[in-house]
């Protein structure tokens, strides 16, 4: 029983770390953005979304970045995914202008992803909810972050 509980805890901590890294990536993109769309579903997308729902649209000097939520692009991913389409990051973490626009899975196994723009409070509330089986039980993890919108133009 202890071994199973330890395995569940390790899995929970690993999935939580994946969520926090995903939120860090969005925060990094937001810090490099010049504008944010109030209606990402109406904005011109950085690439094909293949039926996924746009949840966040940023404008940067290197080009637009679209985050979308929905069906995974291939069977290797678990459940629904959060994808990022936009300029790639260089080794220094800065966005590279002029290159290809990769469309990559940020995190999989999602039940829900919410990006709520709260201009009156000057923040973006981003939430990721995952559900997965571990030790024969369903576990759910929810991570949320408030991201500062200071200096961003509302598009």
Where are these regions (language model features)?
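Surface-exposed beta-strand edges and their flanking turn/coil or helix-capping segments
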Residues: 28, 95-100, 139-141
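Transition segment at domain starts
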Residues: 21-23, 38-45
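Short linear sequence signals and composition-biased patches located at protein termini or domain-edge surfaces
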Residues: 102-155
């Amino acid at each position: 029983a202890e071994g199973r509980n330890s395995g569940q805890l390790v899995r929970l901590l690993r999935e939580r770390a994946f969520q926090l890294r995903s939120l860090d990536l969005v925060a990094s993109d937001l810090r490099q953005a010049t504008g944010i769309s109030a209606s990402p579903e109406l904005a011109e997308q950085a690439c094909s979304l293949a039926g996924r729902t746009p949840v966040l649209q940023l404008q940067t000097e290197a080009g637009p970045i679209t985050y979308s939520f929905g069906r995974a692009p291939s069977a290797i991913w678990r459940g629904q995914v959060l994808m990022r389409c936009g300029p790639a990051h260089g080794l220094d973490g800065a966005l590279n202008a002029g290159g290809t626009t990769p469309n990559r899975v940020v995190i999989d196994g999602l039940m829900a992803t919410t990006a709520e723009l709260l201009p009156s409070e000057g923040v973006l509330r981003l939430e990721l909810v995952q559900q997965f089986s571990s030790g024969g039980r369903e576990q759910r993890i929810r991570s949320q972050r408030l991201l500062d919108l200071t200096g961003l133009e509302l598009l």
